[in-house]
Amino acid sequence: MQQDLLVYPDPKKQERYDRAYMRMAQEWSRLSHCTRKKVGALIVKDGMIISDGYNGTPTGFPNDCEDAQGLTLWYVLHAEANAIMKVARSTNNARNATLYLTHSPCKECSKLILQAGIKRLVYLNDYKDPSGLDLLEKGGILLQRLVMD
């Protein structure tokens, strides 16, 4: 693990914080109105939470994420995209930050993660298509799959 990307040099302390942030991302996922899959995201920089997000429809749209057949509507925003856009609207940025995700990102969101300057991704569950993780790995992002009790 690249030490310069970690806030805490003690691995045990870093793991405690990683788990705490992931539990918070899980809480954020519960705010999603999506029924098929609820995903939460947290962006942490220099030991501070600078953004959060969960999957859902754009502001002003009905909070219905799936169509009558239960398929996700094309315009539903992913949790990490919401979190990245939220920090982009602020006076802060995600450069050298850690992104905590309850599910690994899709390939489209992986491009956003790279462009945002995020350097570390901690995730809990695998997305069905691993190409997002492959892209992040090629881009030099430190990837860590967390196993929670």
Identify the function of each model-found stretch:
Residues 1-149:
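Zinc-dependent deaminase catalytic domain
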